[in-house]
Amino acid sequence: KGYQYLPVVLKVIAMTTIKNVSEHQAGICVTMSVKLPAILTRQLAQTSCPSLPDPMNRYGYLAPQYGGLRIRACPSGTIYSENQCRYKSNMNGNGGLRGSARKQFRQCSAEFKINFDDGFKDISKGGLAFDYSHISLRRGKGVFVGNSKLYIWGFQSRFLGKTFAIRMKVKIKRGAGKYRPEPIISNCGPNGDSSVEIVVHRGKVIFKAKTSDNPEAVFITEDYDDDKWTDLTYYYDGNHFGGSCNGRPFRQRTGGNLEIRDNPMTIGLCTGQNGFHGEIDELEIYTACIPKDM
């Protein structure tokens, strides 16, 4: 705290916008200037996009966080597009997908995937930072007991835009959410209400999406069976918010971008709420594509 790291990839920004940082200081910790947030604000306001291209790495981008910039990686098979303010498929000079990227997109790869078979391991190639607490393992399942949570830091301050999807398999314990909502997955937290969320409350699974074109969030409510495995899907494609609960599909028209939250994507627990009681077998999160079977 009180310091801001300026890595080498930010050298162009540091040298041209912060007068008290010299060339030899790029890449070391320097005392943070109060001018930095204003500089970032101007940089981002020029495009109305909540992220900036990484001048040294087309496979990543820069996102504001805690008054500074954080380097984010694009999903495998994609590059960052400043014009589109999001990932796009990695095209070669002839306008076609490279072989590896073509395979990635045909398969629609998840950016984060965990199934608890090998413990707490992200088995995707997304490389997102995450952490967990108070989750136990039972026969390849994650057991959540009310104070358990897994939080994915890679989604903090993340631009989700018009392409986002979740697939998960859960077993909701009888009585879960009887008195207060229990979040299964959400970008809830102290820095704003959630824009993406699946919770259990009073015998229902409730799906939520908050987009930039709508003043009110969209909520969809579905039934489920206690103590039985439930397949959940959630997607937003820029025009519709949809998903399914045990194969029963839902879809509602909406528009705009999923709103950004300066919170990590959290599984199992939100600040000030009851935590989830149940088990999770699989969790997949997609940001570059939506699987065709959703």
UniProtKB/Swiss-Prot annotation:
It is found in: Secreted. InterPro entries: ConA-like_dom_sf. GO terms for cellular component: extracellular region. Keywords: Secreted. It comes from the Eukaryota. Component of the organic matrix of calcified shell layers like nacre and prisms. The keyword Secreted applies. Its main location: secreted. This is Shell matrix protein. The lineage of its organism: Eukaryota, Metazoa, Spiralia, Lophotrochozoa, Mollusca.
